[in-house]
């Protein structure tokens, strides 16, 4: 089994408890980050009806926020589709959002035509894509010229502030234990801090986006640098 296959299998295992663990472990703050991402992305869009693809959609949380924030701001949305390689996560998503379309596929092979989407989002998922550069090139293929890629992620912090050190302590010592208790899978929540430590810094992620044909519009970290929002436009 490849590393990517192991990650997908892990998410299949924790799918039934994933949403509850997320809310508890983030203390609900992740909802603020998701709303911020949607609102800011919409501010860069024009008046035409939007096609949105949420990659690594999991149980569909971000898809729900795109719909809700869009409705609140009278944004015209033609479609919102979710793509994820975990059938366990997608199964939960289909129960939560039966009116939305989900596809089981990796980030590197999106079931969409060239230049067909206005927004591609990936929330806390790009870190789990082993073939990351290939995925970014695939995002570029599917997006229209001027389309947006919206990334929310836990990034590696090479020079953490005092608050950042508190974040790291929480991630390494508290999160795996609580997540393990909720999901009965300690290993899955031990993976999170380990994967962050092995991931990119903000600067390196920005460089990869630019190398894949995007220009950065926005990049900022929130809540003790726990979460980073990046928005880039296809050239």
Language-model segment annotations:
Residues 1-19, 171:
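N-terminal, positively charged/glycine-rich alpha-helical extensions of SAM-dependent methyltransferases
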Residues 5-6, 152-208, 212, 218:
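C-terminal alpha-helical "lid/dimerization" subdomain adjacent to the S-adenosyl-L-methionine
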Residues 28-49, 65, 69:
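Conserved alpha-helix/loop element of class I SAM-dependent methyltransferases that forms part
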Residues 51-109:
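Class I SAM-dependent methyltransferase SAM/SAH-binding core
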Residues 108-120:
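A short acidic, Gly/Pro-enriched loop at the edge of an enzyme's catalytic core
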Residues 118-132:
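A short SAM/SAH-binding and catalytic strip from SAM-dependent methyltransferases
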Residues 133-148:
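A short glycine-rich, Lys/Arg-flanked "PGG" loop and its adjoining helix->strand segment in the class I
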Residues 212-215, 220-235:
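Core SAM-dependent methyltransferase catalytic element
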